[in-house]
Amino acid sequence: MGEKSVQKKKFILETARKVFVEKGFKKVTMKDIVEACQISRGGLYLYFDSTSQIFLEVLKLESEEADDVFSGSIREDATSADILILFLQEQKKELLRKENTLTQAIYEYYFEFHPTKKDNILKIQFDSAVKIMEMLIQTGVESGEFYCEDCKGMARNIMFVLEGLKISAQTIGITAETVDREIAYILKSLDA
């Protein structure tokens, strides 16, 4: 794919993201994306076959960008505790963000399509986050920053708490105080 095609595809994905944020997943059609991008229907189908394919590409792009932002925020001399606190603070920002979020669209997509474990990007991201969190906690235990007898169990628990907070943010609403309380509980559990 040439540079012009790469840029066009990225433009479509960035524009489609805005459409998914506004309408969720279920209500978005290829026509909506064509109109938002101001391109021909054929021009869109040159790159994508369906709204599902576009949505999954939007999620991948979003994940890559979030990883880049987080990685760029970590100091060279950061300790395991510093990294964990930075990660939890980034999660807090995301949880409290009221606008420009794909959370509703993500849940609509997964409730509608029930992807298998193999192609479920949320499951893949969750499992990857658990592994990274487990390594981070293990490193913190080895350096004496944390105390934890079951690093994998703690990592899984942290990710389930964050996922529960995401759902709560979309359904019943949460406050900064609620998120701070949960973060404090996580840190206390590690004696951080």
Question: Language-model segments: which ranges?
Answer:
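Hydrophobic alpha-helical connector segments
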Residues: 57, 61, 71-98, 154-158, ...
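C-terminal peripheral helix-coil segments that are non-catalytic and often amphipathic
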Residues: 86, 90-93, 131-142, 161, ...
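N-terminal intrinsically disordered/low-complexity leader segments
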Residues: 1-7
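Helix-turn-helix
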Residues: 11, 15, 19-53, 57
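Amphipathic alpha-helical packing segments from all-alpha helical-bundle domains
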Residues: 64-67, 116-142, 156
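Amphipathic alpha-helical segments used for helix-helix packing
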Residues: 95-117
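Hydrophobic/aromatic residues within well-ordered alpha-helical segments
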Residues: 8, 51, 58, 62-66, ...
